[in-house]
Regions:
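Hydrophobic membrane-insertion alpha-helices, especially the h-region
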Residues: 10-27
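N-terminal positive-inside, membrane-proximal cytosolic segments immediately preceding the first
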Residues: 1-13
Length: 139
């Protein structure tokens, strides 16, 4: 009798644990900490310090784009590469894991794609070194 009970309890425990893990994966990798706004957008719910970090990151992109534009206007492809590399994938590692869990999957995909795109711009600026090519990548 006890063997039969064990044979039923263990799979049930495993199933419950798998459901808990699946729920956590959905919450922290797919959904994040979000809510719908009345205008249909998705708001990411962050603590004030996390919000400040996110805004700093966005300002960094604007500043980096300004640096790239200025370097392009001077045909300074080394300057383009330097500015683009500063916005590349290495910068994505600055985001704390707790904050990363609050970001929805679509946002994470966009962020990693954007950082990767700037790495590509940096590499192409060094190897291809054509300002028009870089402008095409930015558009």
């Amino acid at each position: 009798m006890t063997g039969t009970i064990r044979n039923r309890i263990y799979p049930a425990i495993i199933l419950v644990l798998l459901l808990i893990i699946a729920g956590m994966v959905y919450k922290f990798i797919v959904a994040g900490s979000t809510e719908k706004t009345p205008d249909g957008r998705v708001a990411i719910l962050l603590e004030p310090a996390e919000r400040d970090l996110m805004l700093k990151e966005m300002r960094g992109f604007v500043e980096g784009l300004q640096e790239i534009s200025e370097a392009l206007s001077k045909d300074d492809m080394k300057g383009v590469a330097k500015a683009a590399r500063a916005m590349g994938a290495s910068r994505a590692h600055d985001v704390p894991l707790g904050m990363m869990g609050k970001l929805p999957l679509e946002f994470k995909k966009l962020a990693f794609s954007t950082h990767g795109g700037f790495d590509t711009i940096a590499m192409d600026a060094e190897t291809i070194a054509l300002p028009k090519h870089t402008l095409g990548q930015l558009s």
